[in-house]
Amino acid sequence: MITVATAECFTHANIGLTIHKAAAGYEDFEFKYLFSEEDLKLMKNVRVISAMFVPSIIGVEKLLDIKLPEPDFNYKYAKAYSEEKDLEVAKLMAEGLKKKLNVNISIGSTAGVGRGAICILTDNNRYLFTSDVYANLITFENIKERQKNGIEKGIKRFLEILKKEYF
């Protein structure tokens, strides 16, 4: 059984929830179109331990026992970084989650100003990438488009990695 956990910000736990729904055999769910029949069969070997939406620095630091860098931008109570720091923070989140829950695959996501970042950490490798959509959390420019693209890209990459490393 392959165990998975996510700590997500800009993707609002949708990567983890979608993986859970596919693994649990839900008949219909929002991003089902990303899964082939073969993918859905493989997902029977996956268990989601946790899928979290964690927008705040204090939430990430306390839940994952990690220290995050200072935000690049002031934004209400949530964290807002530049794309460069988003890449660092997504990696820190995935590492903290993997250490805390001892899962096979951990996923972290965060986005402030830029394309955001997603990190998928497996037992053997780290995959760090951005969405394809530039957005600005401070002005709300393109944030819904970036979110959808990040969810889709995160799920697609998860499936590629799952097949490459575990099946």
UniProtKB/Swiss-Prot annotation:
Any matching Pfam family: HcgF
InterPro entries according to UniProt: HcgF
Family: Belongs to the UPF0254 family.
Protein name as annotated: UPF0254 protein MJ1251
Lineage: Archaea, Methanobacteriati, Methanobacteriota, Methanomada group, Methanococci
